Amino acid sequence: MFGSDLYIALILGVLLSLIFAEKTGIVPAGLVVPGYLGLVFNQPVFILLVLLVSLLTYVIVKYGLSKFMILYGRRKFAAMLITGIVLKIAFDFLYPIVPFEIAEFRGIGIIVPGLIANTIQKQGLTITFGSTLLLSGATFAIMFVYYLI
């Protein structure tokens, strides 16, 4: 489900995210994240890995890096993105020794874990994960119906 499907899912995810944010005031981990995760929503191991790396990114920046650096605003956002990228690269190095489901993690947008982690620090874990999974599921469902037609 890539190529033009990726573009359709991203546009759909952005539109759903905008509508959701306008109606509820809750931002689902960046506008592009539900589109990316909607593409792989039928692979629970993959979704769990993305959420795990996002949580790990948040914990490393909040309780690790922020003890040694002054992080706020753009600096904190950059630290979240860079930490997420470094963790994803670490997963890429583990590729030969991990199961196939984890190897598929290599295909996800490299900034997705950082975007989710940044939203966790703003809105909290439950709200971020809940809204992101809700909109990713909605994106997946709409794409599924699109394929049936």
Swiss-Prot record:
InterPro entries, per database record: Capsule_biosynth_CapC
One of the record's GO cellular component terms: membrane
Single GO BP term: capsule polysaccharide biosynthetic process
Pfam family, one: Caps_synth_CapC
Protein name: PGA biosynthesis protein CapC
Gene source species: Bacillus subtilis (strain 168)
Transmembrane segments annotated in the record for this chain: none
Gene disruption phenotype: Cells fail to secrete PGA into the medium.
Reported function: Required for PGA (gamma-polyglutamic acid) biosynthesis.
